[in-house]
């Protein structure tokens, strides 16, 4: 027994010595203040309250109202471009121009037609291609400057001097998303769209002492819109013999329908009232679910606009979305009329600006420099300048690399100003000299 006690004594002593260390190991860790949430937080939403980190009912209401507000705000600022092109299509439809038909302003534009950035000294032509039944062909005339954008106003391909026809005119074959059918080996400038409809537009320049008639006549003579027939022109017989494609007929295309736009009353400008969300829903229902980046589609879905589902916000959401719409419109208009980034202006202190030189047509990387050795691209920035994109599509129609090229005689270069030499906004009731 003594031997047992003699054996256990050191063990008990060791256990007693170890007790403080066990107690130390079980004591709570000091929590850094940086990872805790205070019981009360003062914010622009008011006082937010948390009990042991758990939000109160009043806090939940404030936070979720604000979250839904931000989603509705972004649905406007990030996606105005889609509603803008939808509004343009609706404007054309309002005067009877259907998809795959052509609108031409033979006598130039005037104030009866509401467009964002139309000029009054070029002959405009435009239309919408419906790709739901397959690829469409657009034939364009020589000396015609234009572009094709998809239904989220993303660039597809240029027409004319900046495009593959280089001002000589030609046939453009526009292919819808997920098309797996046969395509020609030659004879067409082929471009794939990410949406089932695309908007094309361009202009011809005045000749013969500012007479628009020669340009308008050339447009009517050469412009054609018609469906692509697989296995026809552009498909060699060898492809058929190899079993790769069925032969199609080689027949003249159906006549293109033209509509006169000069003097017509139409509105192509996107709205900033509740109809904005209704039009945004129409686009989402019309286009493939994958037609827009998921990050951009996320806020749209968060406010209840989801492909294949009814858009029916309750009274709470409608109130929040209406307020967000007003703030988003005010923000977009402020960005357009008075940008805060000094790099967007042509030189320090100037009212003249064009941020595409700084951001490029994708609002990410400046346009390349043109040197004696050729084009000198800038490295990608890795981020998109969101304010520039919001600014651009709020006040301008169309996007293309050709809108910011340092190449004379190829594309277009723009400088615009919204204030006079005294930095006062232009007044439509006054006359100004340059």
What name fits each language-model region?
Residues 1-7:
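N-terminal secretory signal peptides that target proteins for export/translocation
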Residues 9-20:
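Bacterial N-terminal signal peptides
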Residues 25-434:
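A compositional/structural signature for long, glycine/proline-rich flexible linkers
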